[in-house]
Regions:
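Terminus-proximal functional modules
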Residues: 1-82
Length: 82
């Protein structure tokens, strides 16, 4: 039987901010929020890299917010366990 690894990615303002609960930015969370957010990979770049590593996007869920541009997206990826 095939086993899988999974990633749950949080996306805010077009940036992948957390993967499985771990911060993805190069600038620590806190302080300058814009700098922290800008240090995270954008969705397109992240998905390109993840695809090269064997990850497949299997689902996206959008959690609407009061401001439409502030919606929180959750990306769900999987790949076979090696």
């Amino acid at each position: 039987m095939q086993n899988y690894e999974y990633q749950v990615c949080s996306v805010q303002y077009g940036r992948v901010t957390f993967i499985n609960g771990a911060w993805r930015g190069n600038v620590p969370v806190g302080g300058d929020t814009n700098a922290s957010l800008e240090s995270c990979p954008n969705v397109w770049e992240y998905l390109q890299e993840a695809g090269r590593e064997g990850w497949e996007l299997v689902s996206v869920i959008t959690h609407p917010q009061e401001r439409p541009d502030a919606a929180l997206d959750m990306l769900y990826l999987k790949r076979p366990s090696w």
